[in-house]
Swiss-Prot record:
Keyword Signal: yes
Covalent lipid adducts (S-diacylglycerol cysteine), residues: C26
Family: Belongs to the BamB family.
HAMAP family: OM_assembly_BamB
Function: Part of the outer membrane protein assembly complex, which is involved in assembly and insertion of beta-barrel proteins into the outer membrane.
Protein known as: Outer membrane protein assembly factor BamB
SUPFAM superfamilies for this protein: Quinoprotein alcohol dehydrogenase-like
NCBIfam families: assembly_YfgL
GO cellular component, one term: cell outer membrane
Source superkingdom: Bacteria
Topology of this chain in the membrane: Lipid-anchor
Subunit structure and binding partners: Part of the Bam complex.
Length: 386
């Protein structure tokens, strides 16, 4: 699960945090310790009705680095076998499907004109909006989180703690910035965000950066977590999931760290911070921030104060994804292919749906048509409320 490596080698050390491994080095499911056993699914009083609207096959497999991108009425998605495609949001119909002719480790990011994916050896591959390969370029190390595309650039975060931008038209490297990294890093479902000309990215060690997408200059830096402890494992922390932005607020959560909301209109001043440890990520609405902790206990925090509003422990150890919003519910996927819907107001279980295809690893996406899920077997599933 961990490996030590020589200085300068990509991912100087890595901890794999997937649906089947605990950081203790033991399988959660084979352990005799009841603390790590997934909660059994229990009966509940349904509070909403959900259904599968459509299913579409992208390719084979899934992974932490594979979160589909939704733009308008289109979905861009990829799978580890090299499959890449564009799909209609309303029906799931494939508009185009292509192949990267390589195994993939991350994808797909898109701005509607350029769609980018990445390989385990750091190759970045861009497609035009007909599915034809546009260019190939090389990052300095492996890329394990989805690229982001916009403002004329394709941006990737590589395993040597570099954030790099390539010209979206021809693949020319535009800029590269690097921060010193910790001895161990987390392989997590991290995501970058592009907003108002800035690349918002977390880094191993608990930092959150806002980077000018045109120049690579760091415009702002915040601390989500501070490594603590005597050993490298105790000091392991990383910003997980996607940073969330709503108005003047930017919120993020870290493994072995905190959940924090910053005021971007006041130079990134922290508004509140609570000790918290998540392995997947968070989502926010106009009232609350929602996040599962590393044991899959879901909590809601008041967005203005950080006060804990509710906790839901009925899904404990089910390896929940980052949440998505659907109506008055919060949706999370789990290791058996179920999507659970919790009340935003009090956390009670409202609905449950099996979408099949094995463990859901990439976070569900809120769309105008419902919640989009990429399954463990490489399919897209649209879930709608009746």
């Amino acid at each position: 699960m961990m490996r030590n490596s020589r200085p300068g080698r990509a991912w100087r050390g890595a901890v794999v945090l997937t649906g089947l491994l605990a950081l203790s080095g033991c399988s959660m499911f084979s352990s005799d310790d009841d603390r790590y056993k997934p909660a059994e699914l229990t009966q509940y009083a349904p509070g909403m009705s959900v259904r599968t609207a459509w299913t579409a096959s992208v390719g084979s497999g899934s992974g932490l680095g594979f979160a589909p991108t939704v733009l308008g009425e289109s979905i861009y998605a990829a799978t580890p076998d090299g499959s890449v495609g564009k799909f209609d949001l309303l029906s799931g119909r494939a508009i185009w499907k292509s192949s990267a002719d390589a195994k993939l480790s991350a994808g797909a990011g898109s701005d509607g004109q350029t769609t980018a994916v990445a390989t385990p050896d750091g190759e970045v591959i861009a497609f035009d909006d007909t599915g034809k390969i546009k260019w190939r370029a090389r990052a300095t190390s492996d890329v394990a989180i989805p690229p982001v595309v916009g403002y004329g650039v394709v941006v990737v975060r590589s395993g040597d703690y570099r954030i790099q931008a390539f010209n979206a038209e021809n693949g020319e490297r535009m800029w590269s910035m690097q921060r010193p990294g910790p001895a161990l890093a987390l392989r997590s479902a991290a995501q970058m965000v592009l907003a108002e000309g800035l690349v918002i990215s977390g880094l191993p060690g608990g930092k959150l950066l806002a980077i000018n997408s045109a120049t690579g200059n760091v415009q702002w830096e915040g601390t989500v977590a501070t490594p603590r402890g005597a050993s490298d494992l105790e000091r392991l922390t990383d910003v997980v999931g996607a940073p969330r932005i709503a108005g003047r607020l930017m919120c993020a959560v870290a493994y072995q760290g905190r959940i924090v909301c910053f005021d971007v209109s006041a130079g990134g001043r922290p508004i509140w911070a609570k000790d918290f440890s998540s392995a997947s990520g968070m989502v926010i609405d106009d009232r609350f921030a929602y996040a599962p902790d590393q044991g899959s206990v879901v909590s809601a925090f008041a967005l203005d104060s950080g006060n804990n509003v509710w906790k839901q422990a009925e899904l404990k150890n089910r390896l929940l994804t980052a949440p998505a919003l659907l109506g008055e519910a919060v949706a999370v996927g789990d290791f058996e292919g179920y999507v659970h819907f919790l009340s935003r107001s009090d956390g009670r279980l409202l609905a449950r749906l099996s979408v099949g295809g094995g463990a859901i690893v990439s976070p569900p996406q809120t769309t105008s048509q419902g919640v989009l899920v990429q399954t463990g077997n490489g399919s897209l599933v649209m879930v709608r409320a009746n």
